[in-house]
UniProtKB/Swiss-Prot annotation:
Family that this chain belongs to: Belongs to the major facilitator superfamily.
Protein name per UniProt: Putative uncharacterized transporter YgaY
Gene3D superfamilies, per the entry: MFS general substrate transporter like domains (1.20.1250.20)
Record keywords, A-Z: Cell inner membrane, Cell membrane, Membrane, Transmembrane, Transmembrane helix, Transport
Amino acid sequence: MTKPNHELSPALIVLMSIATGLAVASNYYAQPLLDTIARNFSLSASSAGFIVTAAQLGYAAGLLFLVPLGDMFERRRLIVSMTLLAAGGMLITASSQSLAMMILGTALTGLFSVVAQILVPLAATLASPDKRGKVVGTIMSGLLLGILLARTVAGLLANLGGWRTVFWVASVLMALMALALWRGLPQMKSETHLNYPQLLGSVFSMFISDKILRTRALLGCLTFANFSILWTSMAFLLAAPPFNYSDGVIGLFGLAGAAGALGARPAGGFADKGKSHHTTTFGLLLLLLSWLAIWFGHTSVLALIIGILVLDLTVQGVHITNQTVIYRIHPDARNRLTAGYMTSYFIGGAAGSLISASAWQHGGWAGVCLAGATIALVNLLVWWRGFHRQEAAN
């Protein structure tokens, strides 16, 4: 990519952070509404959980097949077009009269909301090398805040006008954001000479040849699976006795997650200073311990909030560290690196949603916590038994 004469100003960083959060939020508005949507369409818990899975599978497909286009086409035009198409997907969801139609709209929204993952490497490219980790951390905080605050906003809007109102409003906001991005982003022309099949092939080539990318992608996959296991079934827990919370109250729990996400921002700075292996080890240990507090959440709201704070802090911290590390590998191929890493990341999220819904249906909250703790332990063992030693040496 040709780097333009365009400063990465604080205002532009804020715009890109908001755009990233708004785009990815479109995949998560449904989570606190699952109980309501399930009753609307007469669905079981596991069937309702597939709505979230469809969004994440659509997102994973977009990561693999659309994000590499950021290394091929002019980025501003690509970003604005995908933002408008994501808005169109939410219009389908808002007007759906069947589960099949809702899944179609959700999948299309997920497919094009990967625009968030074109904005992240764009910010990394515009940032100076000594501030790259910090900038990526800020943009990624916007992304995770979007995921978490989506639940709060969705719950409040659903209380005011029903669950469909959430998607009507979100669609309008995405259209307005497309206009703001058109006005605010610099133009960046591609310098790659690869065609589309070669771009996709290079993603797989990087996976085959680069141990660090494979390691970080696996860590991201397992970490985000943990995140999805918690948030997919939490609406069912909080809507049932002894809590019996409304959609609006359930959505407010996203604020606890948002606080945890903000607390992880320094992880990018630590990675800039060469301490990525320390933040990864510490984060994965805390991730495992967070499930103890989450388990007590079936009777204690305070324990659940503490668990949410710790889990979201560690998920975001490890994620920021992962991206800061992989962006050092091939500076001219950051969109393709993002495609490979984030495809693994959201495949983990989709798998976590399915595991969570099934665990809830068959084992209740104890089953959900057991599934989450098991995957957290596997993640820690994968890192501890060799990966972190090689990366620290590198």
